[in-house]
Amino acid sequence: MRGGYYVLTALFVVASSEIAAESGHQLQANNHGRKIDDDAAMKSLSTRFLRESRGVHGNVANEERSVYSVLAGMINEGIKKMPRTAEVLKRKSRVIDPSDKIPHEAKLVEEMFHAAKAKETMESAEEYNELKTATEDAEKALKKHWNPSKTAVKGDDSHDIHSNEMLSVKNWWVDFTGLKSTVVDDTQDDMVDSVHNAFVTVCDKNIKPTREETSFLSRLLNWKVANSPRSVHKQRLIQRAQRYVILDLWKMQNTCKVWPEWEKLSDTLKFSVLDYLLNLHYQRLVRMYNIFARKRPDRNPAPLNPELNLVGNTGTSAAMAVNKNSKGQIPYPSEPLNAASTSKGERFHLIKRSKRTSDGNTDIASLPSIRSKVRSSKSVMPLLTESTTSGDHSVPAKRSRFSSSGLSRAFSPYKPGDHTFITENSRLSFDGPRSAVDPYTQSKKHSTKALAPSSTVFTPEDVDTKLSLGGIYDRST
């Protein structure tokens, strides 16, 4: 090795001297000049000695050409490999160092790749339409969420929840007690329907809020929270979006041809699909919340929207039961106090009575001839979350107990070796039917109606069905 080193050094010196002599410059003694001359020699070796040598004849010229051509090829190949070698070494050092975190951009690219791969894999399933149906309505609504709403352009946006946040299933703080069914008392159906119809009038046509969602938003905005009401409301919306994702999982698991395809996916791909579903539902809920907070259809009469046909072919809102007169004219629904209309000689008076309750709600208008008993808003809206309100204080309800009889495990504590993802106080896995939970509980005071996403309709029998979450665990100690 030492002999080869001296040979290479001598060759570099000779070549550099010849190049410098031809160009009329002498080699400089400082390091900077030496580096420049060395670089010039390395770059010119591959071309200078491949042509015929000048002033050299016979075998000596042939020998020089062969030696220098081989040497020049080796040097050039080494130069080309140096950047790649440095890059490989840099990558290895990053992998070895556990404290070095992957940049956010790299994570984003990786997640996008997995999401695209998951979508491509799921589309190959025989019954992919079942999964597609579960997300179709929410996906259509999401397309307009990033643009201003046509029906909610005006209004106070100080209470809006911004939708520029992407949620992740891995970061769930899951409270499964919030999965109990939403119920509405039969005696209050008319009141809920009127508010719901008014809410539909002020919403974009692609949002399509349900009765239960309308009741949920009304109770949420009337819930008196002393500190940070917006952040508390945001958490409730996130929990509801999580509920919708689990209902989608439940529907997919009950489709025998889809679930085996789902179980074939890796956990990474499953989380990508669930992240997609979670954000679709969350963005839709945020849009509904902001419109409801601005318009307050539970307090203010809704303007007529001719684009939405809610009562026959009249194009009027079902929330405002205003009769036409003989000329077919309709009084503006926000007329104060009395709105009178004449039809066939008979005169009807619609009196708008606004009675403020103790918790700030307003009762619905009623005809004076029919004195219907209207309860306060505390009993009007259904129990939607785990806590109930009493005045200005929140009273937490008891945690519902989940039974896993007949199943191998449900809500089991963490055990070493389990292939699950650990969150703050929950575990999320995909073990299929061997883990199940019955999140619904029957209410003695209310008739049960299962809450479902806008794209899914559940019957009362679904309330009694055990909901298998595909291995999503949580147990309170």
Curated annotation (Swiss-Prot):
This is Secreted RxLR effector protein 102. The RxLR-dEER motif acts to carry the protein into the host cell cytoplasm through binding to cell surface phosphatidylinositol-3-phosphate. It comes from the Eukaryota. Residues 1-20 form the signal peptide. A motif (RxLR-dEER) lies at residues 48-65. It is found in: Secreted; Host nucleus. Secreted effector that acts as an elicitor that induces cell death in host plant cells. The keyword Secreted applies. Keywords: Host nucleus, Secreted, Signal, Virulence. The gene is RXLR102. Its main location: secreted. Residues 326-345, 351-370, 376-401, 433-455 are annotated as: Disordered. Belongs to the RxLR effector family. The keyword Mitochondrion does not apply. It comes from Plasmopara viticola. GO terms for cellular component: extracellular region; host cell nucleus.
